[in-house]
Amino acid sequence: CRLLPSGIGRDLAKQTWKRKEAIEGRTHIIYITCSKWLQGEAKQSALIGQNTIECIPNPIDTNVFRMVDKAEARRKLGLPADKRLVLFASQRVTNHNKGMNYLVDACRKMAEQHPEMLENTAVVVLGGHAEDLREQFNLPMFPLGYVSDTQKIVDVYNAIDVFVTPSLSDNLPNTVMEAMACGVPCVGFKVGGIPEMIDHERNGYVVKMKDSTDLATGIHWVLNVADYEMLSAEAVEKVKQCYSQAQVAAQYIAVYEKALANSKTKEV
């Protein structure tokens, strides 16, 4: 982990590892990760790599995160009705790991290649310190600040046309799941579990890592080239089939049934 110290001397991670290693019966533990990427990382662990590791995604409430009227959502948020809106969201948008600089560069490149986007496209930034970024964008920018109200977040997703997540590291981001549930195509770097969520050129666009040119291509493709209605419908369907509460609950039930069956076999 890049956040851990060099390993010289004593550190909390090493002490925690030793305590976990000493747990009796740990070889019978079934581990669950929420992404295939994390499952692959776990399989390389000297501590749990020989255990059963299942992959079950986190669920989303599709009765809450769903499509609503776009025009009404924009009216409630004070966003323009005559522009295509690109959303970036983070708890703290100035966090370098969230890749805001790549989106800024991508917007600059889009405006250079497609000057009409200066008039018909804008960026919406959701999260703390959003106002600090206004001067960085050449496209019009609307900072919404930090929002905690769930219904307002649903309105934000429904108000925009594409959600962009240029994170440099991530697992299975809820923001992508929430946007897709609201019928919003997503564009994101090929990192962590993001490519598991975004099916390239089917419900969004998977971008080459740290490539602002490809990021610009992906955003422009979603807004101007692709069959937008198809992308939107595919995004909603992906969430229903993979991330709905009913689907995830069924997977957990299957794991518990498997664990109980194995336990009874060992008792016999």
Predicted regions: what is each one?
Residues 168:
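Aromatic "clamp/platform" in nucleotide-sugar-dependent glycosyltransferases that forms part
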Residues 66-79:
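A short helix/loop element that forms part of the nucleotide-sugar donor recognition site in Leloir-type
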Residues 200-201, 205-212, 221-226:
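Conserved acidic donor-binding segment of nucleotide-sugar-dependent glycosyltransferases
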Residues 185-188, 198:
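Short hydrophobic beta-strand element within catalytic cores of glycosyltransferases
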Residues 9-55, 60-64, 70:
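A short, active-site helix/loop in glycosyltransferases that binds the activated sugar's phosphate group
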Residues 114-121, 127-154, 162:
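Nucleotide-activated donor-binding/catalytic signature segment of Leloir-type glycosyltransferases, i.e.
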Residues 227-242, 251-254:
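A short, well-ordered alpha-helix in the C-terminal region of glycosyltransferases
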Residues 80-98, 104-107:
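Conserved donor-binding/catalytic core segment of Leloir-type glycosyltransferases
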